[in-house]
Amino acid sequence: MRLKLTSHTCLFALSSLLVTPAFAAPSGDNTASDAVERGSEPGIWQRAGNNLSDTWHHWQSQELYVPAMTWHNRWTYDKAKTDRYNERPWGAGYGVSRLDRDGDWHSLYLMAFKDSFNKWEPIGGYGYEKRWRPLENQDVQLGLGFTAGVTMRDNWKYIPIPVLLPMASVSYQRLSFQATYIPGTHNNGNVFFAWLRWQF
């Protein structure tokens, strides 16, 4: 059963502010038909808008996000810092998603978790992954893509911060292990963050 419109409004409002169209992928039938009617391929901005609109209006699954781990790259951090950082990102999230005609994954999501300083950090946005099915068993899938979103952190006084990050996943049926890597400098950034995603 679909959740109330208010939750979807939050998802769309966040993601529409932050999507980075240069990375948008072709979406489903609506986008393709629009391009045919105009007799040309859609532009970057139009393709990004179509991906957001199709995911918003034609989502196929709801998703539960459960943060699983945070790992600070030991090659770029002093031990004194990693010893006191939190690497158990308790939290949860919700999203909606669809597969386009190529079988690729598109999502709008919201998630909140405990950050490195054990403070709450919300993030919301749009996610895309190109999907591969390397085995004869089509239930096993690999994904590679990006997420474009907005996050807010306690140590930045909860000022909205745009983010554009790589994303990869390993999926079996409805369960996915999904992760990103936040690049950075010495004692800053360089964090591997992973979560479980369950479709229902």
From Swiss-Prot:
Top-rank lineage group of the source organism: Bacteria
Protein location: Cell outer membrane
Keyword annotations from UniProtKB, A to Z: Acyltransferase, Cell outer membrane, Membrane, Signal, Transferase
GO biological process: lipid A biosynthetic process
Marked site: Role in lipopolysaccharide recognition: K81
Record-listed E.C. numbers: 2.3.1.251
Keyword Iron-sulfur: no
GO molecular-function term, one example from the UniProt record: acyltransferase activity
Active site residues according to the UniProt entry: H72, D115, S116
InterPro entries, per database record: LipidA_acyl_PagP (IPR009746), OMP/PagP_b-brl (IPR011250)
Swiss-Prot/TrEMBL catalytic activity: a lipid A + a 1,2-diacyl-sn-glycero-3-phosphocholine = a hepta-acyl lipid A + a 2-acyl-sn-glycero-3-phosphocholine; a lipid IVA + a 1,2-diacyl-sn-glycero-3-phosphocholine = a lipid IVB + a 2-acyl-sn-glycero-3-phosphocholine; a lipid IIA + a 1,2-diacyl-sn-glycero-3-phosphocholine = a lipid IIB + a 2-acyl-sn-glycero-3-phosphocholine
Leader peptide range in chain numbering: 1-24
Main location: membrane
GO cellular component: cell outer membrane
Class in the EC hierarchy, top level: transferase
UniProt-listed NCBIfam families: PRK11045.1 (NF008271)
Record text on subunit structure and interactions: Homodimer.
Family: Belongs to the lipid A palmitoyltransferase family.
Its job: Transfers a fatty acid residue from the sn-1 position of a phospholipid to the N-linked hydroxyfatty acid chain on the proximal unit of lipid A or its precursors.
Protein name: Lipid A acyltransferase PagP
Taxonomic lineage: Bacteria, Pseudomonadati, Pseudomonadota, Gammaproteobacteria, Enterobacterales
